[in-house]
Amino acid sequence: MRFYYTLLATAAALLVHSDALSAAAETSLNQLTAVDGTTTTSQRFLRRHTDSETTDNEERLNSGPIVLDTAKKIDDLFEVEKLDKILDPKMADKFLDGKTFFGWLDKSALDEALNGNIAQKTKVFEHWREKRLRPKALTKVLTTDPAVRKKYKFVYEMYDSYIKYVARKKLSGLKRNRGD
């Protein structure tokens, strides 16, 4: 019961010291503005109004087209021109000119494996297998330079697949012979 008396006394004290009664008397519902009308205010706006915003438009777009130059910025970010220069196949040819690997593997054999038909590729891969060239060793040699890696990636992946194919074929032949 004391709580209610305390609450009533607090509310009465607040009403006495506030101007709630005078504020209620000043407001009037008779003063209505038009729907399209605007009222002036002396408060500052955070948004700056310009002549282009005279319509009731929520969008703040410029009237002209927006030109984005993101493709150029992305090219600059990744330095695409520099990468193209590094990965140029001509750079791979310059790197491999006059070099032999393992004492017998040269650029002409790599080019034949890259550009030849299936029979030529099989012949080259058989020759490499007879020389006991391991796919990991070939991959290690051909991935030393980025341009060589890009140009001859097909060769070392195909040679690895060829070696696995020959091993599977040999294993299946052994299984057939054992079953007879």
Curated annotation (Swiss-Prot):
One of its GO terms (cellular component) is extracellular region. It is found in: Secreted; Host cell. InterPro entries: RXLR (IPR031825). Residues 1-24 form the signal peptide. Keywords: Secreted, Signal, Virulence. Induction: Expression is induced in presence of citrus root extracts or during the interaction with the susceptible host. Pfam families: RXLR (PF16810). Its main location: secreted. A motif (RxLR-dEER) lies at residues 44-60. Disulfide bonds: none annotated. Belongs to the RxLR effector family. The RxLR-dEER motif acts to carry the protein into the host cell cytoplasm through binding to cell surface phosphatidylinositol-3-phosphate. Secreted effector that partially suppresses elicitor-induced cell death in host and enhances virulence of P.parasitica. This is Secreted RxLR effector protein 5. It comes from Phytophthora nicotianae. The gene is RxLR3.
